[in-house]
Amino acid sequence: MKKINLYLITLCLFGGVACTDEDKVGDVGTLPQDYVLPQGESPADDRIVEYYNSYKSYILYEYTQPDFIYGLSQTNNSYIYEKVDPLCMDVVLDFLEDIWFDLYLTEFHAKYMPYKIMVAKSMETTYGTRAYATMGNDGQSFYVNDCSEELKNLSAEE
């Protein structure tokens, strides 16, 4: 019985301390965007902004090493990559439209597209194996490899 009374008294004390007069929480502003679009170095920047407005997914050709390796629970240091040439992003976007974007409705993409799509000219693991497309460790990133002017030379079968 004494333990119960002690617990009740302790609970009342914590409750009384929690009800102090403090200033209200101020206005919390909106958070800035993670990436600034357009990135400014590609003729395809307008198309990339349109995709972001439609799908809320960043298509990035300019990013930093921490952007590339970041994961929610671990980092992804197992890839070596080379950035894509910004001038060939129109070719890359045409390719992505043909094999991905045109296959589903805009509503589907808006709901299920990864948060960011990082485009690389070359990407391979530290073991030397190539990954043509892979999800990042954070579950929000998608990496697309082998993006260059060569994409426009692919046939429909390839």
For each of these PLM feature ranges, what is it?
Residues 1-4:
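Positively charged n-region of N-terminal signal peptides that target proteins for export
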Residues 7-8, 126, 151:
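A broad, structure-centric signal for solvent-exposed, well-ordered loop/edge residues
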Residues 9-13:
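Hydrophobic helical h-region of N-terminal Sec-dependent signal peptides
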Residues 15-18:
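C-terminal motif of bacterial Sec signal peptides marking the signal peptidase cleavage site
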Residues 20-107:
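Acidic/polar, low-complexity intrinsically disordered N-terminal segments immediately downstream
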Residues 73-79, 138-146:
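Glycine-rich, often proline-containing surface loops adjacent to acidic residues and nearby aromatics
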Residues 86-140:
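Auxiliary, metal-adjacent structural segments of Zn-dependent hydrolase domains
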Residues 144-158:
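Active-site recognition of the HExxH zinc-binding catalytic motif
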